[in-house]
């Protein structure tokens, strides 16, 4: 399954900021994602808004939870199941709610 991870943090907890910098944060996050076995499809960053977005693929809830642990340590994490838009359109057509 695909999941969208939306992780936010405050200015005060920003690992790339000046108040509580963590120069190893991206390495920790990369290690955590790889160790968990979760496949990172893509990642995005809204630096001024202090928000990360990741699209990941996994069928293992425990692995998903382990993958995002570094993000939880600096802020809040929301995980939602998603599907590719093209797959959603095909599904909607198949069940008759779209032409």
Pin down the residues of each PLM region.
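Short S/T/G/P-rich N-terminal loop/turn motif that feeds into the first structured element of a domain
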Residues: 1-35, 39-50, 62, 85, ...
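Short hydrophobic/aromatic beta-strand micro-patches
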Residues: 8, 55-57
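An amphipathic, aromatic/His-enriched active-site/gating alpha helix that lines ligand/cofactor pockets
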Residues: 35, 57-89
């Amino acid at each position: 399954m695909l999941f969208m991870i939306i992780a936010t943090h405050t200015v005060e907890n920003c690992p790339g900021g000046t108040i509580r910098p963590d120069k190893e944060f991206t390495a920790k996050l990369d290690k955590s994602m790889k160790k968990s076995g979760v496949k990172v499809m893509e990642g995005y960053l809204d630096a001024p808004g202090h928000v990360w977005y990741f699209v990941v693929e996994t069928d293992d809830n425990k692995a998903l939870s382990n993958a995002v642990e570094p993000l939880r340590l600096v802020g809040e994490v929301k995980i939602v199941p998603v599907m590719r838009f093209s797959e959603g359109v095909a599904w909607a057509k198949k069940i008759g709610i779209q032409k």
